[in-house]
Amino acid sequence: MANGGWVKDDRKLKGEELQAYLEEYTKKHFLKKKVRDTRIKMRGAYIYIFATVFNDHQTRETGKEVWDEMEIARLGWIGGDEYVLAYFRHTGKWQDCLSGTLDKCLQAVKDNEFGLFWNF
């Protein structure tokens, strides 16, 4: 809702279709040696990307393999096919770092364009 009126939702993908697309994309492009799984959570205009990652430190400490779920990225829908990409800071807050199309934002996460997303 902007300026007290309704805003037309003209996203190309939305709802379950968008979630299925993102889950398929993240599993295809983000799974690596230290990333076992990914999960998408949608809430309002935000899409959160989580990853289950290998915890080297805890594994050495306990002698058992330890995997933790981490916040990787947040996509905030602006309008049309425009999103704002944010990373999760060590302070526990989200920080915006890029705006662009859904594909551009996902590519930035995949390539770790700013060195902000895959820090574990």
Annotate each PLM feature.
Residues 1-61:
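Negatively charged, low-complexity tracts enriched in Asp/Glu with abundant Ser/Thr
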Residues 8, 65, 92-95:
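Short, charged/polar micro-motifs that form catalytic or ligand-binding hotspots
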Residues 77-120:
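Short, compact, well-ordered microdomains
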Residues 5-6, 45, 64, 80, ...:
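Intrinsically disordered, low-complexity regions
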Residues 50-84:
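Short, conserved beta-strand/beta-arch hydrophobic-aromatic motifs that form part
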Residues 36, 43-47, 71, 81-83, ...:
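Generic structural motif recognizing short loop/turn segments at the entrances and edges of beta-strands
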